[in-house]
Amino acid sequence: MSVGSPRRSAPRSTVERDSGNRVQVMSPTVRVAQVADTHAVERALARSGPTLVNVTRSPLALAALATVAVPGLDVFDVRRPSHVGTAYDLAIVIDSERRRWYVRAPITDLAGAALEAEVTLLEAMAQFLNEDALPFAVPNPTGFAHLPEGGRAVVYQSLPGQSLQLDLLGPGPGLSASVGRALASIHELPAAIVENAGLPVYDAETYRQRRLSEVDEAAKTGKVPASLLRRWENALENVAIWRFRPTVVHGDLTADHVLTAGSEVTGILGWSEAKVADPADDLAWLLVAAPHDAVDSIMEAYSLRRTEFSDPHLTERGHLAGELALARWLLHGVRTENEEIIDDAVAMLADLEEYTAGALITS
């Protein structure tokens, strides 16, 4: 997890429109996925709470916590991941049998609370880990170590598979279909497991109002092009597209959080942003970043896996969610008074305005 600025080197490309003048933005919303890949938007906003500690824990300190959490763990090596965020200290511990373990320790009070909720959710999800319900693995907390500052560090063994490579997604059965089925299986989980974990639960109208509030707040910065504000407000005020059944959503899906082996999804990580909300949120990153010829296969497999599925405006809300990620990136920069983030968000919003000029999210 990193709150660093997303790279801005994605190539430009043309806008593709359908017969209803709706747009499928290939770029710069590819960069929206890059924002998400840094885990910077939702996590940075949700984790900016009081700091529990003033010094980042070293990998060796985290390895020591792992030996407390998992008695008998024989540490052979310890590494810090390449992506390190501001909410958690994270280390990879390799034991004498060459097994890999992850150690996470919260840095802020809010991160500590989120970690506890995530653990509760993961424990509840264990009963659904089978081919009929969840056909992939999720982290299984193996042990805990109490922190002197308060809260707990959690240790879990690494899951099989490698991070999803979006360029491997293609049309037809295979990995794209597996991704679609995996997302659908999340959205078929009972809402009670999220509610019982103390994570947020929204109805459709409340969630629409939250999105409107985000747009209003972004508008007050004076840095969002007027045409984008009109585009977003038009979609948000079209109540027809907001008639959906809220589902369990992962809330922080990125390529790094989806593990694959061959043509199958083997695991999904990073559940601390889970909630009951709009299923379109989990599709946004794929709609803007997956190869265009793979999207139909993803959505077909997704639709077939859902039960009693009727949501004709799902992809429209997904594209909107991807665009609004840029507004949240801007707001994060404003709140933290980070001029580099603000400038980056403004540049991406300008690109988005150029590529969506005259196009509609909804007809």
Regions found by a protein language model. Give the residues of each.
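ATP/Mg2+ or Mg2+-diphosphate-binding catalytic cores
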Residues: 12, 22-23, 50, 107, ...
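Active-site acidic catalytic loop and adjacent metal/ATP-binding pocket
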Residues: 85-95, 102-103, 234-281
